[in-house]
Design a protein with these regions (language model features):
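Active-site microenvironments of hydrolase-like enzyme catalytic domains
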Residues: 19, 27-28, 69, 79-116, ...
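Short histidine-centered catalytic/ligand-binding loop motif
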Residues: 38-40, 126-141, 190-199
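Conserved small/polar residues in nucleotide/adenosyl-binding loops
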Residues: 252-258
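Catalytic cores of processing enzymes, dominated by hydrolases/peptidases
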Residues: 144-251
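Active-site loop/lid in soluble adenylation, ligation, and acyl-transfer enzymes
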Residues: 2-104, 124, 128-131
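Short coil-to-beta-strand
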Residues: 16-23, 111-125, 241-248
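Internal, conserved structured core segments that host functional sites
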Residues: 106-153
Length: 262
C-alpha cells in the first residue's frame, strides 16, 4: 500500500509479529506548508534515510510503515493535544475540538506542528497558522498514519497473540538549542526508549541493547529519549503488546555531506 500520506510494505505477506515504523523520514513537503525556512535548515528536522535502514523488514516477514510527509509539517509522534493554543492565530479556545495539553516538546517549538526552525529556533512562520490549518493537517495526515499503524498492530496481535513494534528514529550526535538537553551535550550512538518499562517487556529492550553493545556501540536507555506518542499509544507489555523506540545517531548511517546532497 502506498499513497501520499504513507507507505506500507509487507502487510500482505506478514509471517512474523514484527512491525517497524519510521514517522520522521518523510521528504514530500506539502504545497500549503507556507514556512519561511531555508530548505537546508528545515531538512535537519528529518530522520534522513531511516526508512532505508529498516525497509528490509518486509523481506523477512515483518511490516514496515513510513510517513511520506515531513514531521515539521505535522508530527505523528505527538499527541493531537501537544500544541500551545496561543501559538495559533485564534482567540477563542472553545471553538477547538481538541483540548490542548502541551508537553515540553511544544514549549521547545517541536510539538504537534513545529513552530521553530532547526537548529537554532527561529520562527517557522511569518504568521501563525489557523485552527483550520492545524485540523486539516491532523485529519489528512496525522490521523490516517495512526489509523494504519493501529490497524496493523491490531491485526498482528489477532494473528499472533503478541506484537513487537519498533518506532525508528535518528538523532544528532550533539544536543541543539531546540533540545531539552544542554546545547552541545554529546549523545551515545543509540538511545533505546521503553518509557521506563511501561511500553515494552524489558527482555525485548535488553535484547536490543545487548545486541548493539555487542557491536561496540554506546547505548543508553530512556535518556534523553524514552519514547513519545507512537510508543505510548498502543502498547501494553502485560498483554504482549510491545513498543520500543530506537534512536540512532546520524553518523551511524550517514554523514553531513549525504544530507546536503539528497
Amino acid at each position: 500500500m502506498s499513497d501520499k500520506i504513507l507507505n506500507v510494505e509487507g502487510d500482505e505477506g506478514q509471517s512474523i509479529p514484527l512491525i517497524i515504523d519510521s514517522p520522521h523520514s518523510g521528504t514530500e513537503y506539502p504545497l500549503d506548508f507556507n514556512h519561511q525556512a531555508e530548505l537546508s535548515k528545515l531538512r535537519q528536522a528529518e530522520d534522513t534515510h531511516v526508512n532505508e535502514l529498516y525497509e528490509y523488514v518486509s523481506s523477512i516477514g515483518g511490516v514496515f510503515i513510513e510517513a511520506k510527509f515531513p514531521r515539521s509539517y505535522i508530527d505523528p509522534n505527538r499527541s493531537e493535544t501537544d500544541f500551545i493554543f496561543e501559538d495559533l492565530n485564534e482567540k477563542n479556545n472553545s471553538i477547538s475540538e481538541i483540548k490542548f495539553n502541551p508537553t515540553i516538546k511544544s514549549e521547545l517549538g517541536i510539538g504537534l506542528v513545529w513552530i521553530k526552525i532547526p537548529p537554532n529556533g527561529e520562527p517557522m512562520y511569518k504568521d501563525k497558522i489557523t485552527l483550520k490549518q492545524l485540523m486539516d493537517r491532523v485529519n489528512i495526515y496525522h490521523r490516517p498514519y495512526h489509523k494504519i499503524l493501529k490497524h496493523t498492530l491490531n491485526e498482528t496481535y489477532k494473528n499472533y497473540g503478541k506484537f513487537y513494534h519498533v518506532n525508528a528514529h535518528s538523532m544528532q550526535n550533539q544536543a541543539t538549542a531546540m533540545s531539552d538537553q544542554s546545547q552541545g551535550t554529546i549523545r551515545p550512538d543509540f538511545v533505546i526508549g521503553d518509557r521506563e518499562g511501561t511500553s515494552c517487556h524489558r527482555k525485548f529492550t535488553d535484547l536490543i541493547v545487548d545486541f548493539l553493545r555487542g557491536l561496540n556501540y554506546s547505548v543508553d536507555i530512556n535518556y534523553p529519549y524514552k519514547g513519545m506518542e507512537l510508543v505510548k499509544a498502543y502498547s501494553d507489555p502485560l498483554q504482549n503488546k510491545n513498543s520500543v523506540q530506537i534512536e540512532a545517531v546520524s553518523y551511524t548511517h550517514l554523514t553531513l555531506p549525504t544530507i546536503l546532497l539528497v
